[in-house]
């Protein structure tokens, strides 16, 4: 596994980070609660958290070093058909010839129809080495967005929608560039 990581890192050094689009899925539900709270001196902060997770959401997103390229959320698990629809309807129009679509190794990412779709616009599919979320800048974005969702404590789909898009709006170009750099992509000064 270590050799695969080293090979991946070496191969990515020859690619301009501006040509790398990173895609990943994340999940959330309606029980998100902030990890931090304030209380008067001598009292413990109480943060009620629903016991029933209620509706669960899957979020699919793609980023570049400059911006969030595409995002979609649904109230079910992502499968091959949903993933294909995301690529075809939302992401494909943003991919350019010579770009690389970087994804993890989940089975439905590896479908031949996904590869053909991406290659139809002149882009290439690249997979992260196994167990390497630390090489994926979008993981850092999901972390920031989920912290913002927690602060809003959504309990309805409308509240979740607002919290998600507030979190996404708070992601800056500086964040994205820093996350690419933290993941080892050589960002020009």
Question: Which role fits each region the language model picked out?
Answer:
Residues 97-110, 136:
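Acidic/histidine-rich, metal-coordinating catalytic segments
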Residues 45-52, 121-137:
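RNase H-like polynucleotidyl transferase catalytic core
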Residues 17-20, 138-189:
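C-terminal anion-handling pockets and recognition modules
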Residues 22-23, 99-103, 127-129, 180:
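Short beta-strand segments
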Residues 2-88, 184-185:
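Extended, low-complexity cationic-aromatic segments
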């Amino acid at each position: 596994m270590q050799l695969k990581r080293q090979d991946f890192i070496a191969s990515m050094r020859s690619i301009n980070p501006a040509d790398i689009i990173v895609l990943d899925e994340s999940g959330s539900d309606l029980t998100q609660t902030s990890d931090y709270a304030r209380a008067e001196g001598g009292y413990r902060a109480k943060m009620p958290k629903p016991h029933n997770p209620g509706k669960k959401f899957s979020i699919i997103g793609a980023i570049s070093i400059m911006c969030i390229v595409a995002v979609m959320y649904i109230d079910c698990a992502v499968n091959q058909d949903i993933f294909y629809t995301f690529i075809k309807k939302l992401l494909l129009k943003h991919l350019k010839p010579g770009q690389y679509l970087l994804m993890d190794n989940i089975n439905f990412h590896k479908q031949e129809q996904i590869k053909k779709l991406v290659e139809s616009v002149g882009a290439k599919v690249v997979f992260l080495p196994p167990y390497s979320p630390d090489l994926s800048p979008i993981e850092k974005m999901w972390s920031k967005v989920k912290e913002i969702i927690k602060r809003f404590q959504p309990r309805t789909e409308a509240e979740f929608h607002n919290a998600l898009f507030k979190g996404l709006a708070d992601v800056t170009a500086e964040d994205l560039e820093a996350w690419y750099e933290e993941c080892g992509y050589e960002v020009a000064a």
